[in-house]
A protein has these predicted regions:
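Conserved catalytic core of two-metal-ion nucleotidyltransferases
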Residues: 38, 46-53, 59, 99-142
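A sequence-composition feature that detects small, non-aromatic residues
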Residues: 18, 25, 29, 68-69, ...
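Solvent-exposed, flexible loop/coil residues
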Residues: 35, 77, 82, 120, ...
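Preference for short coil/turn "hinge" residues that link or interrupt alpha-helices
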Residues: 33, 40, 66, 71-74, ...
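Short, functional N-terminal and low-complexity linear motifs
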Residues: 13-23, 71-75, 123-124, 140-142
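N-terminal regions immediately upstream of nucleotidyltransferase
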Residues: 1-63, 81
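Hydrophobic/basic alpha-helical segments enriched in Actinobacteria
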Residues: 23, 40, 94-97, 101-102
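Active-site nucleotide-donor binding segment shared across nucleotidyl transfer reactions
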Residues: 48-99
Length: 142
C-alpha cells in the first residue's frame, strides 16, 4: 500500500535544466581556477543529486519504489561528461509494466540534460543479474 506523499508544487523541467547548467558551469569554472579533482567529482554528485531528487519527486513515483545510484555515481564520483548510472528498484516484476511514472522520470532526466544509464529491477533481479554478470556486480558494489 502506498502512503500518500505530501502535496508539493512540481518544478518546471526548464527550471531544473537551467539550474543544472548554471551549477555545472560554476563548478567547472572553479575547477579551472583551482584544479581540485575531488571537489569537482563530489560537486558533480551534489548537483546531480539535487536534480534527481526534484525529478523523482515530480514524476510521482510510488513510495514503494527506490532510486539507487550505482557505478561511479554511486561511489560518489561523477566526471563532468559521464553518464549517471541508476537502478530503479520496484517491489515486483509486474510493477515495471504498470508504473507510468518510470517513463516520466526517465524522460525528465533526459529533458534536463542528465545523460542516464538506467535499469528497472526488483532486488531479487539485481541479485540474479549480479550472480551471472560481473559488470553488474561491480556496478552494484560501487
Amino acid at each position: 500500500m502506498n502512503n500518500p506523499q505530501p502535496p508539493h508544487q512540481p518544478t518546471e523541467s526548464g527550471t531544473v535544466r537551467a539550474e543544472l547548467r548554471r551549477e555545472r558551469a560554476e563548478l567547472i569554472a572553479r575547477f579551472r581556477e583551482r584544479p581540485e579533482v575531488h571537489r569537482l567529482l563530489t560537486g558533480m554528485v551534489r548537483i546531480t543529486n539535487r536534480s534527481l531528487i526534484t525529478l523523482w519527486r515530480d514524476s510521482g513515483m510510488p513510495t514503494d519504489c527506490c532510486l539507487a545510484a550505482v557505478g561511479g555515481y554511486g561511489r560518489g564520483e561523477l566526471q563532468p561528461h559521464s553518464d549517471v548510472d541508476l537502478v530503479i528498484l520496484v517491489p515486483d516484476s509486474e510493477a515495471v509494466h504498470r508504473i507510468k511514472s518510470i517513463e516520466t522520470f526517465v524522460g525528465q532526466c533526459w529533458d534536463v540534460g542528465l545523460v542516464i544509464g538506467h535499469s528497472v529491477r526488483t532486488v531479487e533481479q539485481c541479485l540474479t543479474e549480479a550472480a551471472i554478470d560481473v559488470t553488474v556486480q561491480t556496478s552494484l558494489l560501487e
